[in-house]
Amino acid sequence: MNIMPVSESLMADWLGLRKLLWPDHDEAHLQEMQRLLQQTQSLQLLAYSDTQQAIAMLEASIRYEYVNGTQTSPVAFLEGIYVLPDYRRSGIATHLVQQVEAWAKPFGCIEFASDAALDNRISHAMHQALGFHETERVVYFKKHIG
């Protein structure tokens, strides 16, 4: 396995995995990806198999605003992680997360946070396996006023 930061030349691989993680955001992907590549406080990683197949992706950022369940700022935040089903439970996610931890420390981060949908038990189990612990559950509301 080989892990590398995303670059322009790897956009197609990143896009393919990103669409598997967030299938409902098809049209917005490319614009957001271009924006993310320009930000110094975001990190995008791809993992490749020994046969050079893109098998996992991770997106992380440094957040300075309040992050639920944390006590400090800035905080490293796991924005998204996806490992192809055939490669899960093989340590790939652990290696990706370890790279984020090393990347975030020079920013002054001592906490690493993430979130998951309330009903996404697979994500909850993955987070726990990666060393995260649940801090709180939140339901967001909105109201149209216009």
From Swiss-Prot:
UniProt keyword annotation of ATP-binding present: no
Biological classification of the source: Bacteria, Pseudomonadati, Pseudomonadota, Gammaproteobacteria, Moraxellales
Q: What is this protein called?
A: Aminoglycoside N(6')-acetyltransferase type 1
Organism of provenance: Acinetobacter genomosp. 13
Family matches, as InterPro entries: Acyl_CoA_acyltransferase, Aminoglycoside_N6-AcTrfrase, GNAT_dom
Q: Fetch the Gene3D superfamilies from UniProt.
A: 3.40.630.30
A Pfam family that this protein carries is Acetyltransf_1
Which reactions is this enzyme annotated as catalysing?
A: kanamycin B + acetyl-CoA = N(6')-acetylkanamycin B + CoA + H(+)
Q: Which PROSITE patterns match?
A: GNAT
Q: Name one GO molecular function term.
A: aminoglycoside 6'-N-acetyltransferase activity
